[in-house]
């Protein structure tokens, strides 16, 4: 359903003038005040740094209730999707709005699988990077470069081209991610295999070598598939908003997704699991936790508790519970069940959930708390953590971009500002300046 105007209005009083603003209701969640005509009526802008109280669009894709700890894709709880489905099923759901039938699922899987190869010239493109280039730098460049190789799917006004571009990115970005990893460690690229499932194929491309057979570990493949599901979309976050605002200009889909990857690279967005892992390593052992907690509580200390709390969730992150279970399974399978980091993580979580200081501040474990340990146990270096995030989030970005393109109300993004700089002044010739 689209947003509906309610009978309610909000009245803004400025001096002796009143402005009635419509209130719209969605299917669930907070109502919104429509300020679209406020500037024309009053000459006033609204001020909301970080857009924390601003709805920039209508969307039918993902719903979050941060107070209740709820995350739903197209109405389905994330717990049910992670427990019962696979990543490509979630991709279909996000793109089309409903879970696929068996026939639709097979057709969709086949289409993705047969798009995993990238143009052979991409291998030469990679050779232009330094071997020590960060994989995320390589990802931003290589995903943007897809538009040069697949210009038959860059017309955003053609629904067929939009869908082909969507299939290509879901399929090829994992291949590019694996290539970025292989390039940085000096190993040859590994071609995708059509006989493997999505997560299996990614593990194969990352860890197989030509000189010996690589056997897919089903526990690791299942865990990675679930990690992809958990990270597939998360409403209007920084990178998704970046994709939408880039797309609002009419940019091609490959450029828009590259913009999203660039935003995700920021440590405040995609690098949270790296920070959580570094924190656990710094603590080192369980006996050091009380000292660490004391520093966290000290206002004069710069020590911060990473992997706890969330910009949106004011309750337990529903993804964290699933990730915790997967973390244990992966560590057991890889022989890292006694990993000191896990012991520190478990004790730190126990203390944080029972300590009134953290309860009052609603600092609950988030998805990043356990994901770093899990990915490390799988064999991925820290530099690849955000790359895997990008692989998972690609389908969310594409779904949001497609929704924006089809939205008749969508306009080019143009935030306004509160100017606080110097007021008008006249030019002074350089010889007369002091």
Swiss-Prot record:
Coiled coil: none annotated. The active site is at 310, 368. CDD domains: EcCS_like. Its EC number is 2.3.3.16. Pathway: Carbohydrate metabolism; tricarboxylic acid cycle; isocitrate from oxaloacetate: step 1/2. It catalyses: oxaloacetate + acetyl-CoA + H2O = citrate + CoA + H(+). GO terms for cellular component: cytoplasm. InterPro entries: Citrate_synth-like_lrg_a-sub, Citrate_synth-like_sm_a-sub, Citrate_synthase, Citrate_synthase_AS, Citrate_synthase_bac-typ, Citrate_synthase_sf, Citrate_synthase_typ-I. Keywords: Transferase, Tricarboxylic acid cycle. One of its GO terms (biological process) is tricarboxylic acid cycle. GO terms for molecular function: citrate (Si)-synthase activity. The keyword Transferase applies. SUPFAM superfamilies: Citrate synthase (SSF48256). The keyword 4Fe-4S does not apply. Belongs to the citrate synthase family. NCBIfam families: cit_synth_I (TIGR01798), PRK05614.1 (NF004126). This is Citrate synthase.
């Amino acid at each position: 359903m689209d947003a509906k105007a309610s009978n309610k209005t909000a009245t803004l009083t400025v001096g002796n003038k009143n402005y009635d603003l419509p209130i719209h209701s969605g299917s669930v969640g907070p109502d919104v005040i429509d300020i679209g005509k406020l500037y024309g009526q009053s000459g006033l802008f609204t001020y909301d740094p970080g857009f924390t109280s601003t709805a920039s669009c209508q969307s039918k894709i993902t719903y979050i209730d941060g107070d209740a700890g709820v995350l739903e894709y197209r109405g389905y709880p994330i717990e049910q999707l992670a427990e019962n489905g696979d990543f490509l099923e979630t991709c279909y759901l996000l793109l089309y709005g409903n879970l696929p039938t068996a026939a639709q699922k097979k057709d969709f899987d086949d289409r993705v699988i047969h798009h995993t190869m990238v143009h052979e010239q991409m291998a030469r493109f990679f050779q232009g990077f330094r071997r020590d280039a960060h994989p995320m730098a390589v990802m931003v460049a290589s995903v943007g470069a897809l538009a040069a190789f697949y210009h038959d799917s860059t017309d955003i006004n053609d629904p067929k081209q939009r869908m082909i571009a969507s299939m290509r990115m879901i399929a090829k970005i994992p291949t590019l991610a694996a290539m970025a990893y292989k390039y940085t460690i000096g190993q040859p690229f590994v071609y995708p295999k059509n006989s493997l499932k999505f997560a299996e194929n990614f593990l194969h491309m990352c860890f197989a070598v030509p000189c010996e057979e690589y056997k897919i570990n089903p526990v690791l493949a299942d865990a990675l598939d679930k990690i992809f599901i958990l990270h597939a979309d998360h409403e209007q976050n920084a990178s998704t908003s970046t994709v939408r605002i880039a797309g609002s200009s009419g940019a091609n889909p490959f450029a828009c997704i590259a913009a999203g990857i660039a935003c995700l690279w920021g440590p405040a967005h995609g690098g949270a699991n790296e920070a959580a892992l570094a924190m656990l390593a710094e603590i080192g052992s369980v006996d050091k936790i009380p000292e660490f907690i004391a520093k966290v509580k000290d206002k004069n200390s710069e020590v911060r508790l990473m992997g706890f709390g969330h910009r949106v969730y004011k309750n337990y992150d529903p993804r964290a519970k699933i990730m915790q279970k997967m973390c244990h399974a992966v560590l057991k399978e890889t022989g890292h069940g006694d990993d000191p980091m896990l012991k520190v993580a478990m004790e730190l979580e126990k203390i944080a959930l029972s300590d009134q200081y953290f309860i009052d501040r609603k600092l609950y474990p988030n998805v990043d708390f356990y994901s770093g340990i899990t990915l490390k146990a799988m064999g991925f270096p820290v530099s690849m953590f955000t790359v895997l995030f990008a692989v998972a989030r690609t389908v969310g970005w594409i779904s949001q971009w497609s929704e924006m393109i089809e939205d008749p109300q969508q306009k080019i993004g143009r935030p306004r500002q509160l100017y606080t700089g110097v007021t008008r002044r006249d030019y002074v010739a350089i010889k007369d300046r002091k």
